[in-house]
UniProtKB/Swiss-Prot annotation:
Keywords: Ribonucleoprotein, Ribosomal protein
GO molecular function per UniProt: structural constituent of ribosome
Family: Belongs to the universal ribosomal protein uS2 family.
Region: Disordered, residue numbers: 244-272
Name this polypeptide is given: Small ribosomal subunit protein uS2
Gene3D superfamilies, per database record: Glucose-6-phosphate isomerase like protein, domain 1 (3.40.50.10490), Helix hairpin bin (1.10.287.610)
Amino acid sequence: MPVVSLAQLLESGVHFGHQTRRWNPRMSQYIFTERNGVHIIDLVQTAQLMDEAYNYIRTASEQGKKFLFVGTKRQAAGIIAQEATRCGGYYINQRWLGGMLTNWTTIKTRVERLKDLERREESKALDLLPKKEASVLRREMAKLQKYLGGIKNMRRLPDGVIMVDQRREYNAVQECQKLNIPIVSLLDTNCDPTQVDIPIPANDDAIRSIKLIVGKLADAIYEGRHGQLEADYEDYYEDYEEYEDDYEGAEGDLDLDSANEEESLEDNNEEE
């Protein structure tokens, strides 16, 4: 039985690509036709590649391997956080900081700083400080939580990355390639399938499409870890249209630690 049916893919709008003038010719093998100036993705291939991705991720999860979810676009951010949390994965859903993986040693020090601030907050130690000093530390903690909260429990580099929009997450792709970390990615018709290990041709702009694909890949991780899916998982698949209005993307700068920003983090301004 396939992981996802053609009917589910159609219903979620997975087949809608970009306008024909915005395509990447390397995606031609995954394009079924063109309609009203928009490319239509071949859902038969999408379903087949979903099976391949699901089996790969489930097997890797059975072996104890860990996955990082990456999706910083507004439509994907909320889904990435919820699905990664649900299956026990890690996630980056705000801005990708330069060196997130290739400079993991430095990033890890910022994660430890976040944990320390959270411990001090939980123990009420911050309440004992002067109000101004406590306020500064709480602002620092909030910013660290925003950008690094999804990898707070990640003790080492991930064994694989699940990504939404390879084109947007170009810096993440480069770092994965340098470290030989496998990438499973949703690819719209403007993406490059040669940059990832398992491509999943799909609409990476529609919330329902992202939810369906990312949700199934999260299922694979959960099944690999626990042997079966929870009975109430079907109830979990709510309509994610609410994220389009309610979820706010990342804003502001990346001054995570003004004291040593230059040596610890690079501002990634890669935008679509």
